[in-house]
Amino acid sequence: MSSLKERKEAFVSGLEGGSILEINVVTSIALTSYLCANLISYNDTQNIPLGIDFVLNWVAMLLSFTLYSQDIYLLTTLCLIPSIGWFLLNYKRNLKQSKNTVKHTTKEAVQKFELTKKPFLTAYRSGMLILTCLAILAVDFQIFPRRFAKVETWGTSLMDLGVGSFVFSNGIVSSRGLFREKMKDKKDKASSIKKIFAATRSGTTLLILGLSRLFFVKNLEYQEHVTEYGVHWNFFITLSLLPPVLVLIDPITSYIPQCILAMLFSTVYQLFLIKDDSLLTYLVLSDRNTFINANREGLISFVGYCSIFLWGQTIGFFILGNKKTTNNLYKCSVTVSRDKKNRTLWDRLTTVGPSLGLLIWFIITYALSEGLYLIHPQTVSRRFANMPYVLWVVCYNTAFLLCYSLVDKLFGNSSNFYRISTLLEAMNCNGLAMFLISNVSTGLVNMCIPTIDQNDKVSIVILLIYAAFLAMVSFSLYKHKIFIKL
C-alpha cells in the first residue's frame, strides 16, 4: 500500500490543466470583489467593514476555485446584486459624492514627476497574492479541482498562471527602484558595484528561505513534485536570483529597452526549444544524475521568468507615476511631457497614461501570442517557462490591470483620492512576508492533517480558518505599522 507521501505526490502529478477561458472567469472574482467594494463604499470616506472586506476579498476568492468552481457566474451574481442594491439605495448621496470627487480630482496641479500609490495597482497585487496564498494549501485537498493545479509539462492552469503573475508583479514593484535612481543627482547615483551588492543582499534572504524549505522538505518526509522545479530547486530560489542577475543588464537597458530584452530572451530560448528536439528530449527524459540534470527545470525556466520580470518593469514605467513621462510606454523616464505641439509623432505615440499603455501592450502581446502559435503550435509550458507561457502571463496581467484601472476611472479613484479596502492594503504592505507565512502554514497543515483524505465540508472549514488566519496576520501587521521587507 502506498504511503501518504506517495499518495500526495501522485495527487499533484501528471495533470493536464484546463482552459484559459475558465481561468480568466475564475480569477475575475477578484476584479468583481474590487468593483463591489467600490459600490459599497462609494458614498463614504471610510473603508468597508472588515467582515464584508473579508467575505469579498478572501472568502469569495476561496469559493471561486472550490465550492463554486462549477458555478462561478452564480458566485459573481451573489457578490454583485447586494453591492449594486446598496449603491442604488444610497443613490442620492452617491451622486453628491460623485460631484465632490470630480471637484477633488480636478485640483491636481502637480507638475513634478512623483511615484504614487494607485488603488487599482494595490487591488491587483493584493488579489493576486490572496489567490496564490489560498491556492497553495487548497491544492492539497480533494475539493480543489485538479484542472486548476500545476500541469505536468504542457497546458494551462490557475496555479501555473499564479507563479508567473507573482514574478510579473515583482517586476512592476522593482521599477520603483529604477525610477528612484533616475531621479537622483549624478553625484548621488549608486555605482554598478553598489547596485550588484544591494541586489545580492536583497536576494540573499529569499535564497536562505529557499534553502530552508529544501532542508525541511528533505528531512520531514514532505511531498515533492520533482518536475516542478527539480530535485533541489524551488520558487524561492528563482525569486532570490532574479534581482542580482537582472541588475547585471541594467547598463544595457540604457540602449535597449526592457521589453526588447524580454522578447529577445524568450525568442532565442524558444528557437532552441523548437529547432532542435535534443534540448526538449533532454529536458523531459534525461536522468537526474548531476546537480544540473537534477534541477534542469529550475535552471532552464529561469530564462522565462527573467523575461516576465522585465515585462513587469516595462508596465511599471507608465503606471507608477503621477504624470505621463516622455516615451514611458517602453522606457523608464522622469521627464514630464508638457508641450504637445512640439512633440514628435513617436513621442506622442509612446507617451501614455496607465489605461492606454495597458491596452497597447495587451494588444501587442496577444497578437504576438497568436502569431507565435501560427508559426509553431507549441503549447504553454510553465515547467520550462517557454515563450507561449511568458506571453500568456503578460497578456493576462495587462488585461486584468486594464480592467482594474477602468474601475478606478469609473469611481474616481486616484493617487490623490486613494480608496482601497483595509485587508487589500494590509496584504499589499507585506506581500512577500505573507507569501512566506502561507508557505510555512501550508507545510504545518499538511504535517498535522491528511489533507487528501478530507471530505468537502471538513476541507472548506479548514481552508476558511486558514484564510481567516492569514487575513488576521496581515491586518495585525498593518495595524501595528509593521512592514517586513524581504
From Swiss-Prot:
It is an enzyme of class 2 (transferase). One of its GO terms (biological process) is protein localization to plasma membrane. Pathway: Glycolipid biosynthesis; glycosylphosphatidylinositol-anchor biosynthesis. GO terms for cellular component: endoplasmic reticulum membrane. The keyword Endoplasmic reticulum applies. Its EC number is 2.3.-.-. Keywords: Acyltransferase, Endoplasmic reticulum, Glycoprotein, GPI-anchor biosynthesis, Membrane, Transferase, Transmembrane, Transmembrane helix. It is found in: Endoplasmic reticulum membrane. The chain crosses the membrane at residues 20-42, 48-68, 71-91, 119-139, 153-173, 197-216, 229-249, 254-274, 299-319, 355-375, 387-407, 432-452, 458-478. GO terms for molecular function: glucosaminyl-phosphatidylinositol O-acyltransferase activity. Its main location: endoplasmic reticulum. Glycans are attached at N43, N342, N413. The keyword Flavoprotein does not apply. Belongs to the PIGW family. Probable acetyltransferase, which acetylates the inositol ring of phosphatidylinositol during biosynthesis of GPI-anchor. This is GPI-anchored wall transfer protein 1. The gene is GWT1.
